[in-house]
Amino acid sequence: MKLLVIGSGGREHALAWKLAHSRRVSEIIVAPGNAGTATETKCRNAPVKVTDLDGLLALAQREAVNITVVGPEVPLVAGIVDCFRAAGMRIFGPTAAAAQLEGSKAYAKDFLARHGIPTARYAVHTNVDAAISDVRQQGAPIVIKADGLAAGKGVIVAMTVTEAEAAIRDMLSGNAFGHAGARVVIEEYLDGEEASFISMVDGTHALPMATSQDHKRVSDGDIGPNTGGMGAYSPAPIITDEIHARVMREIVNPTVTGMIADGTPFMGFLYAGLMIDVHGAPKVIEFNVRFGDPETQPMMMRLQSDLLDLIEAALNGDLDKVQAQWDPRPSLGVVMAARPYPKAPITGEIISGLDALPANVKVFHAGTALDAAGCVVTAGGRVLCVTALGSNVSEAQRHAYAGVASLHWANAFQRSDIGWRAIMREHTVTLNVHGPV
């Protein structure tokens, strides 16, 4: 079977890598791909941009692709699933209408409110003065979100009213996010711990994937601006069995039935970004309509089932008949980025050490390319995700950072504390069992 994976990030490298494990897969085309997918077993790249829907469809038809899997949100919101389906091509992902769950934060908040799904209080504004008046009335901390797609960087957690006002002006007047910032969502600040809850959905049924937790802020200690994600681990210990059942009952299943009721049934990967409060009550912070990045990388390290089997079950409406099997060991991924990300990064620098990695480490490429001499060079802000399994999160972290230590380029940087919340929990459990040391 021949597959097409659309995208060029670490998520797409991880999806292609896992799909290549299927005995039924003969070849995977990754469009446009990166230096990692260019050399991955069974994979080859095709130089077609994710925004070129006609070009991607022509590629799939020319190559007689059996199934297409879409990685990033941009082509989904643009309607690539509608485009492929109209041409009779099998593709896994939501329609443009269903993808508005991520494409518009205002749409998502209205959907949540309409269907009684727990989320933060909110208001939507297009006028600067009205938005600022709202913020002054509510006070800080408060959350300001650009309505549209902003590559994971359109959320400002303002700790002061002054900071909130500046964010509003940047989005509505300063054009900081272009059309994506033409509307803003002002949200109640929620206390608690975040987690990523991703499910496969076939339109009617939802199959939960492994839980995970990412690290949005650029610097250690969860400080600095938001990024697309600086690392992740799976599973997320905050999601206990009880909370897992509650998320399915109160959030995931009502979302699936709500989309059906609204006439926009959802098929694809449904990502619920959650805040879990001290009482274990989950609320939706955001929806994404695709696998998370970098959550995909540690999740694919743990997935023991054939991913193609799961995707085919979803396409056939049979997710209620399958289960996903997971390695019980945790996995952790550390993103290596290029300075000064999340600002425009320095690119074109040769990466060394890729041929000398520890055996228990897998490196998923994101912002990489091959230069004229065949060397792997930096080509984006988030460059690599160094991923490893371990008997616990502490061990997975040690393995991943051992891999990081063997990789080098001039302007590389990474956080040094990926997994800190889970590791703190492990240490607490050890102290409770053995007493103070």
UniProtKB/Swiss-Prot annotation:
InterPro entries: ATP-grasp, ATP_grasp_subdomain_1, PreATP-grasp_dom_sf, PRibGlycinamid_synth_ATP-grasp, PRibGlycinamide_synth, PRibGlycinamide_synth_C-dom, PRibGlycinamide_synth_C_sf, PRibGlycinamide_synth_CS. Residues 109-316 form the ATP-grasp domain. Binds 1 Mg(2+) or Mn(2+) ion per subunit. It holds the Pfam family GARS_A. ATP binds at residues 135-196. This is Phosphoribosylamine--glycine ligase. Belongs to the GARS family. GO terms for biological process: 'de novo' IMP biosynthetic process; purine nucleobase biosynthetic process. Pathway: Purine metabolism; IMP biosynthesis via de novo pathway; N(1)-(5-phospho-D-ribosyl)glycinamide from 5-phospho-alpha-D-ribose 1-diphosphate: step 2/2. Its cofactor is Mg(2+); Mn(2+). Keywords: ATP-binding, Ligase, Magnesium, Manganese, Metal-binding, Nucleotide-binding, Purine biosynthesis. It comes from Xylella fastidiosa (strain 9a5c). It comes from the Bacteria. GO terms for molecular function: ATP binding; metal ion binding; phosphoribosylamine-glycine ligase activity. Its EC number is 6.3.4.13. Mg(2+) binds at residues 286, 288. SMART domains: GARS_A, GARS_C. It catalyses: 5-phospho-beta-D-ribosylamine + glycine + ATP = N(1)-(5-phospho-beta-D-ribosyl)glycinamide + ADP + phosphate + H(+).
